Amino acid sequence: MVDLFQWLKFYSMRRLGQVAITLVLLNLFVFLGYKFTPSTVIGSPSWEPAVVPTVFNESYLDSLQFTDINVDSFLSDTNGRISVTCDSLAYKGLVKTSKKKELDCDMAYIRRKIFSSEEYGVLADLEAQDITEEQRIKKHWFTFYGSSVYLPEHEVHYLVRRVLFSKVGRADTPVISLLVAQLYDKDWNELTPHTLEIVNPATGNVTPQTFPQLIHVPIEWSVDDKWKGTEDPRVFLKPSKTGVSEPIVLFNLQSSLCDGKRGMFVTSPFRSDKVNLLDIEDKERPNSEKNWSPFFLDDVEVSKYSTGYVHFVYSFNPLKVIKCSLDTGACRMIYESPEEGRFGSELRGATPMVKLPVHLSLPKGKEVWVAFPRTRLRDCGCSRTTYRPVLTLFVKEGNKFYTELISSSIDFHIDVLSYDAKGESCSGSISVLIPNGIDSWDVSKKQGGKSDILTLTLSEADRNTVVVHVKGLLDYLLVLNGEGPIHDSHSFKNVLSTNHFKSDTTLLNSVKAAECAIFSSRDYCKKYGETRGEPARYAKQMENERKEKEKKEKEAKEKLEAEKAEMEEAVRKAQEAIAQKEREKEEAEQEKKAQQEAKEKEAEEKAAKEKEAKENEAKKKIIVEKLAKEQEEAEKLEAKKKLYQLQEEERS
């Protein structure tokens, strides 16, 4: 109480005009039964609830119908013994669960808020323009994955959900995903619009904020993009000694701050619009970070100057725990389980972790949290892939962390929506029931008895956000400390309130407990699917696979025949081409031969003509020579004749 009055004094000095508000808050805290006492005390579990439930209206409580649900869990502690069977680790008990309540969302109001923003007003131009506003909302806008916390000083539930815009009208192909904060009253009715006087944890200043509202996040996007923006919001409360709630919002985002990869970010919307990238020192960032589970230690720093530190379960297998500054985003790995402390990859990120809502006598250095991770099982008997919540008890002893308890799958008696929204739970390709956040854990005394109700937000089939109320979970867990009835033959006395971490047994038993829980979850999955469309889905799947196989075989046969025909045609064309080349070669050779013969004939004719000419010339020469000789002889004869005549004349 001293811390509360110190804060009130500081707060009143800064804002004298808020004295009245301060007094109202103080009276409200007293009325609600808040006790600012240490979280570790000596003695049995101390119930220090309010006189009446602080989270629920009586009329709402009276309207809830609870039914029993079995929670089959497995423990890592067996009094120091190394266990080899699931039976030796098994713990079974009952809790009660309410029916699911789907949380309404005034999408028309949210859409107008988005359109009025400078960053996202252009989305209005991407909607179909030839349909009504109601049709546009139904076609282009989608929402799911809501995580909430209860703000006691305002008596409202603060919920952060994803709101997606799809230009093509498909939730699995959004242009962008945004974070929207909403308020719900104690009966889970949406408050739209509703204004709260928000106290800034850093300055003490009071500022009115109207909800629903967009949470400011610097998103790098364009109208032609797909799958940009924020995903998987988780909201959790930072511990406070002043009674002023400070919700922290965790989400992942693709950003140039992490080289275009998808990184983890946090923001404190009641403190400032600042968004911090969580960066682990000396660790290469994977392409996509997700599924971190936040929790606070008892020694969390409470200061108006600093947001302090938060821890995360970075992964369950191997178990890795990191510590991050909420002021800078700087993180470092503080725990990693050894090789023997590892199991399969079916266990995924959990809800934010919360402490038990009672004061336990815990040894120094020991802290205990409750959370709901989810399993991801393939081909277990309900759709191809099945997501379901499981209960875990997470423990810190000194500088060691481990899972004390892990349950089989829990569906809270929900017939999970089919992923295609067309058939039974298991009729789609995947069956999705994901726990998003622990809103509150209310403890009350009434008519000499006591009651605890944990409120959990979940999402079905990536289509909605629902809330369920779990009654009696605290009793279920306190049995592990020797309180209340034992439902089986084992004694788990002082499991919570003693240190029993032994490196040679606890890690091995934790692995065995997880394996047993996964095995049990597979058995649950099979039984769940047998009555919720799995046989029909499987038969349809087999028929589709048969048809697909026949189609592929037919296509393969047709392809083979086509390839064969193509090959035969290619061979025919090749043979024809070869024959054509042979013909052309033969014709060329014949042409060459004909040309050669013509040349030879021409040469022969020429030679014959030349020979004939030579012979004729020779004959002519002979004739000429003969004529010349005859002429010469005639001339000689004439000369002799004349000489004779002359001689005759001389004689005469």
Swiss-Prot record:
GO terms, biological process: cell wall organization; microtubule cytoskeleton organization
Start and end residues of each stretch annotated as Disordered: 536-621
Protein name: Beta-mannosyltransferase 1
Phenotype of gene-disrupted mutants: Impaired expression of beta-mannose epitopes and decreases alpha-mannosidase resistant glycans.
Coiled coil spans: 535-652
Single Gene Ontology MF annotation: mannosyltransferase activity
Family of the protein in this entry: Belongs to the BMT family.
Entry membrane topology: Single-pass type II membrane protein
Entry function: Beta-mannosyltransferase involved in cell wall biosynthesis. Involved in the beta-mannosylation of outer chains of N-glycans.
Gene name for this UniProt entry: BMT1
Topological region Extracellular: 35-652
Residues that carry a glycan: 57
Record GO cellular component, one term: microtubule cytoskeleton
EC number of this enzyme: 2.4.1.-
Transmembrane region(s): 16-34
